[in-house]
Amino acid sequence: MLTQLKTYPKLLKHYEEIKEVHMRDWFSKDKERASRYFLQFESLSLDYSKNRLNDTTLKLLFELANDCSLKEKIEAMFKGEKINTTEKRAVLHTALRSLNDTEILLDNMEVLKSIRSVLKRMRAFSDSVRSGKRLGYTNQVITDIVNIGIGGSDLGALMVCTALKRYAHPRLKMHFVSNVDGTQILDVLEKLNPASTLFIVASKTFSTQETLTNALTARKWFVERSGDEKHIAKHFVAVSTNKEAVQQFGIDEHNMFEFWDFVGGRYSLWSAIGLSIMIYLGKKNFNALLKGAYLMDEHFRNAPFESNLPVLMGLIGVWYINFFQSKSHLIAPYDQYLRHFPKFIQQLDMESNGKRISKKGEIIPYDTCPVVWGDMGINAQHAFFQLLHQGTHLIPIDFIASLDKKPNAKGHHEILFSNVLAQAQAFMKGKSYEEALGELLFKGLDKDEAKDLAHHRVFFGNRPSNILLLEKISPSNIGALVALYEHKVFVQGVIWDINSFDQWGVELGKELAVPILQELEGHKSNAYFDSSTKRLIELYKNYNQ
């Protein structure tokens, strides 16, 4: 456990020594701070100079990583050891994008050979849709693709397709359906022509309640309009491992793309779950996405900790969570194409590390994953940045932006990028009472009024942030960015001694929903309901009589 590691008390002592130091002072005393605390990898750079740390902090954090045998645990993941201990599974999302030729054997399975076989089928299918060779039941080309999934079968593909929209096939429109409330699927369907629509049903078991409910609604809509169930074969494909259920639905087994237990949902966009990405963007761009992630994998696996982006970001996060007692972490992308990135990272981070039981089954006596949240940075400035600047919570921030200007939008990117830099500077530097008072007096305010108002215009600063810069929003850079966060999450899971690759927390609610659903549908359940739940069931039933 973290608190039992030999470096932990050293970090506690060091924290007490520097907790009151203001970053302003570090910057004023160290003119090289910005250049020393800056890393570049391929087209991605990290400025971590605006963090509440110094060389001693970093030295101790790297010692902490060594205490945890982080290097050995990184190797164990890449080699296919069953590090998902509660489910006795390997964790090989990295193999999905591997460009190495050294085969990985897992329970007599040739992992890379299996992955590349599915990728080959995905490429052929994608080409047939994009080229117009694959036609609908009236011989129309496909114009719309509907991805039906939830969680990891939705968020990654949605994020990537949105981020890389500029690379999409001009004929194709992407739609994503995950919510089971009925509104989303019906809103999507009313825009579509069944004769030119392709549905991708993404569910490993092909029994996920939300996904199957939406898929059956889409199937009913399609059959009613096409007039014959046999047309399903041309318009529905599945990403699943349950061949029997897929065939019962009416999908041809040749239109089923498999993935494996060694790929967790939140790590699956690189697998057949990314079929929608490949069709929308094309195999060339999908390959570039994989390559960007692979290059980050190699960096994570081989770079010294001192220059290793995922290791550094993971350790800095631990520094705030376990020593500064930070409970929250903000993702603030300053690019419209990255608007779904915070939501994707929410699942990646919180479903992986939102746990309090160690690998040995013991209750952990320290904090693990913070609440991860975020929004488009420029919009967030006018919504909740007030709390970040002057509130009572210490919330580290990841600013994410690109250097590349958008065509036909003169002046826009300069305004956007200036705000990234200004906000990061403001969070670091702040504004003292004396500075606020001087500004108000300079503007001509009465001295007594200025003294009172100045208190409200103080910014304490010392708010930490990272600035992640991509040269441009491209397939390879998005691949690298996602892999960076995947590995950051892994690093923190190792430090906290938790299994980052299971998600038992999603199960209990699903189990309890079964008897409640029976009651709502008018069937008697033998389950026990607390008085609150029972009353709400009756309220629903009475309203819908």
UniProtKB/Swiss-Prot annotation:
The keyword Transport does not apply. It is found in: Cytoplasm. This is Glucose-6-phosphate isomerase. Pathway: Carbohydrate biosynthesis; gluconeogenesis; Carbohydrate degradation; glycolysis; D-glyceraldehyde 3-phosphate and glycerone phosphate from D-glucose: step 2/4. Pfam families: PGI. It is an enzyme of class 5 (isomerase). GO terms for cellular component: cytosol. Belongs to the GPI family. PROSITE patterns: P_GLUCOSE_ISOMERASE_1, P_GLUCOSE_ISOMERASE_2, P_GLUCOSE_ISOMERASE_3.
